Each structure stands twice: as structure tokens, then as C-alpha cells.
A protein has these predicted regions:
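Short, Lys/Arg-enriched N-terminal segments with co-localized hydrophobic residues
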Residues: 19, 23-37
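Extreme N-terminal basic, low-complexity initiation segments
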Residues: 2-6
Length: 169
């Protein structure tokens, strides 16, 4: 077997693996669409995520969502990431990455961190006052910035998203 043939065999194996991976991902999406009984109208997928940056935080924040206390979230959306849109359906995962509920985005607004207000962020349901929220989120986004390679300042654009639970799984 020549080197060229070995190279072609390797390329074919890699391509076949890519096709198997894509097929499995599509089957998972269709399974989740069947499981939830829902489908995004303009997308072939649900965004899947958990709130926070640890399994414990994901479970804690999910509990607030399911109790109706958390109806909004704030996030830093980097240039290469898709921002949420009104009407988007998202699959919220618990700390073990198990689907827990489907939420629908009902409002999206981007503001600088320094322009967020208590009326906005209290909808996150996590803190008792604005100063507590600010200090906790500065710590969170400082960790996030180090992981994702951006610089967090009070001028950082923040995406404020309100949502409603449309299905508990």
C-alpha cells in the first residue's frame, strides 16, 4: 500500500467519523424535539445550556427558574457567539447536564455593565440588593473572562434576556 493510499484511507476514516458524529448529533436534536414536543420555528435545534459555571450553581439557578423566581439572565456574548433572539426556545440543563426545562426568550437587550439597573437584574432572582448582585457578578465575569479570553470592565456589553418556562421535563 502506497503512502498516497494510506493518506486516502485515513482521510476516508476521518470523514466517515465526522458523518457519524453529525448523524448522532442530528438524531439527538430530533429526539429532544420529540421529547419536548416542541420545535424552534426558525432553527433546527435548541440551544442547550446550564446556568452558572459549576454543577452546584447550575442546580441552584435551575431551582430558581422552576420556582418562578428567576425569569431573566445576563451574559457576555462574544463576537463569534450567537446572541439570543425573542422567540428562541432553549433547553436548560441541570448540574449533571440532564435536560430539565424549555424556556422561551421574550425580551433581549444589550447594555454596558455599568448601565444595568436593579429593576433589570432583580429578575435573575439571585440577590437581595443591587450591590450584592454587582459584586457577585463582577467575580463571576472575572472568572469567565479568564476562561474565555476577554477583558471584563464596567463598559463590557452585557446581554440581558428575559424568558418564560414553557415546559418542565
Amino acid at each position: 500500500v502506497s503512502l498516497a493510499e494510506k493518506g486516502n484511507e485515513k482521510a476516508n476514516r476521518e470523514y466517515e467519523q465526522k458523518i457519524r458524529t453529525e448523524k448522532a448529533a442530528n438524531e439527538k436534536i430530533h429526539l429532544q424535539n420529540r421529547r419536548t414536543g416542541m420545535k424552534n420555528t426558525d432553527k433546527d435545534y435548541f440551544e442547550r445550556f446550564s446556568f452558572g459555571d459549576s454543577p452546584e450553581m447550575a442546580d441552584e439557578l435551575l431551582a430558581l427558574v422552576l420556582a418562578g423566581k428567576k425569569t431573566a439572565t445576563v451574559s457576555v456574548i462574544l463576537e463569534d457567539e450567537q446572541a439570543p433572539s425573542v422567540g428562541d426556545l432553549s433547553l436548560v440543563l441541570d448540574g449533571l447536564s440532564t435536560p430539565a426545562c424549555v424556556i422561551k426568550t421574550v425580551h433581549v437587550e444589550t447594555v454596558k455593565f455599568c448601565d444595568l439597573t436593579w429593576d433589570m437584574v432583580k429578575l435573575e432572582g439571585e440577590d437581595e440588593n443591587f450591590e450584592q448582585w454587582k459584586s457577585g457578578n463582577i467575580r463571576y465575569w472575572t472568572r469567565d473572562a479568564a476562561k474565555r479570553g476577554y477583558t471584563f470592565t464596567d463598559q463590557t456589553p452585557i446581554t440581558f434576556e428575559r424568558f418564560e418556562v414553557v415546559k418542565v421535563l
